[in-house]
Amino acid sequence: MNEFDKKPEFLTYQSDKMENYLYDYVLSYDGKTSKYINNYFGWDNSHSNNLDNKYSGKAFRPSICILICTSLAGTLEMALPPSISVELVHNFSLIHDDIEDNDKVRRHKPTLWTVWGIPKAIITGNSILVLGNKVLNEMLSNGSSKNDLY
């Protein structure tokens, strides 16, 4: 692990909250790609050398989302749904990028496509994108305005 793999200290609290929210949200999804999504995030024991099975992303983007929201008089609770949406969309792009670039390792473990094959990796990435969009749609259906999302 080098200095760029570590989470900046000031982001730890926000990213820990986001990771817990992300975990709960994704685990509530019970679709055909659930097992592949859980594998990708390291929340299972298969095909992973991540000993504590904790999500190992730096969570920089969602932490910035949380910091912006809270600095504009929002609360952490208000910021969590859009922050995980940002993280889900980012991870969708990483799965597809790994395939395009023929990358075999991400976050110190085999990439999704090398473990499960390209078709399952593409569908799993797409499912993660759908989850990211679903979070925002749920905010709108729960009374948030489009302006709240910006």
PLM feature segments, named:
Residues 79, 117, 121, 145-150:
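Membrane-interface starts of transmembrane alpha-helices
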Residues 90-94, 133, 137:
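Short amphipathic alpha-helical interface segments enriched in basic and hydrophobic/aromatic residues
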Residues 114-134:
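Multi-pass membrane catalytic core of lipid/isoprenoid biosynthesis enzymes
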Residues 71-75, 135-150:
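Inter-helical turn/loop segments and adjacent helix faces that build the functional surface
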Residues 45, 112, 133-134, 141:
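A short hydrophobic/aromatic micro-motif that marks alpha-helical segments and, especially, helix-coil
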Residues 1-89, 95, 99-114:
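Conserved N-terminal diphosphate/IPP-binding helix and adjacent helical/loop segment
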